[in-house]
Swiss-Prot record:
Catalysed reactions listed for this entry: [thioredoxin]-disulfide + sulfite + AMP + 2 H(+) = adenosine 5'-phosphosulfate + [thioredoxin]-dithiol
Binding-site list for adenosine 5'-phosphosulfate: A64, L88, G162, D167
UniProt lineage: Bacteria, Bacillati, Actinomycetota, Actinomycetes, Mycobacteriales
Role summary: Catalyzes the formation of sulfite from adenosine 5'-phosphosulfate (APS) using thioredoxin as an electron donor.
UniProt pathway: Sulfur metabolism; hydrogen sulfide biosynthesis; sulfite from sulfate
Subunit structure: Monomer.
Organism: Mycobacterium tuberculosis (strain ATCC 25618 / H37Rv)
GO molecular function annotation: 4 iron, 4 sulfur cluster binding; adenylyl-sulfate reductase (thioredoxin) activity; metal ion binding; phosphoadenylyl-sulfate reductase (thioredoxin) activity
Key word Cytoplasm present: yes
Name the record gives this protein: Adenosine 5'-phosphosulfate reductase
Residues bound to [4Fe-4S] cluster: C140, C141, C223, C226
Length: 254
């Protein structure tokens, strides 16, 4: 891919975020994605264009997916065929998650951008010692998730996430649209108001791909060493970083 990235200035992005928050209060997920596409879909993009399976699309926003399911991917692809979808390949994912990523790229009209850290797991072990995730999980997440994502998002004016308010107490007030103070771009959360029932109904009605681990009792899926099955009825994210003073990986700090 070739070409120059076109990204709006921070004042422009802040203004658009405020406008979107006002205009989209109570909007459906599809309406939010349409607004995102109308606002950011044709003003330049990473590398001057992203190749979709069935053609080329120029897009100045990106969708992020942890590959737990393809609900957001399905919604976004219907609005913008060929939309770029970021997957943070930390090197620690379950085999099932990698398989879901590959299946999603095959089934949906999207382009999966496989984003990797600067160092492989083996290189990180050599530099910082084995199993950094157990000794300093915040630093491990920073190196393998936050930094790589930040570098990738520099090429875009907005990112779309699957963040939901019911996921955890830390996400209870997640806005639909905001300016992301961490990555300095517009952040859109089309599923923020969705309940678990909303997700399940959409999956059933649209035959959406789901990570096999979800069926096995993992409602929140991250890196394999830091993900366990939560107790029945517990916070869905309580299986993440069990025994550690950590509840978020740092991607959704703002």
């Amino acid at each position: 891919m070739s070409g120059e990235t076109t990204r709006l200035t921070e004042p422009q992005l802040r203004e658009l975020a405020a406008r979107g928050a006002a205009e989209l209060d109570g909007a459906t997920a599809t309406d939010m994605l349409r607004w995102t596409d109308e606002t950011f879909g044709d003003i330049g993009g990473a590398g001057g264009g992203v190749s979709g399976h069935r053609g080329w699309t120029t897009c100045n926003y990106v969708v992020a997916s942890n590959m737990a399911d393809a609900v957001l991917v399905d919604l976004a692809a219907k609005v913008r065929p060929g939309v770029p979808v970021i997957f943070l390949d930390t090197g620690y994912h379950f085999v099932e998650t990698i398989g879901t990523r590959d299946a999603i790229e095959s089934v949906y009209d999207v382009r999966v951008l496989n984003v990797t850290p600067e160092h492989t797991v083996a290189e990180q072990d050599e530099l910082l010692g084995k199993d950094l995730f157990a000794r300093n999980p915040h630093e491990c997440c920073r190196l393998r998730k936050v930094v790589p994502l930040g570098k990738t998002l520099r090429g875009y004016s907005a990112w779309v996430t699957g963040l939901r308010r019911v996921d955890a107490p830390t996400r209870a007030n997640a806005p639909l649209v905001s300016f992301d103070e961490t990555f300095k771009l517009v952040k859109v959360n089309p599923l923020a108001a969705w309940t678990d029932q909303d997700v399940q109904e959409y999956i059933a009605d649209n035959d959406v791909l789901v990570n096999p681990l979800v069926r096995e009792g993992y409602p929140s899926i991250g890196c394999a060493p830091c993900t366990a099955k939560p107790a029945e009825g517990a916070d869905p994210r309580s299986g993440r970083w069990q025994g550690l003073a950590k509840t978020e990986c740092g991607l959704h700090a703002s």
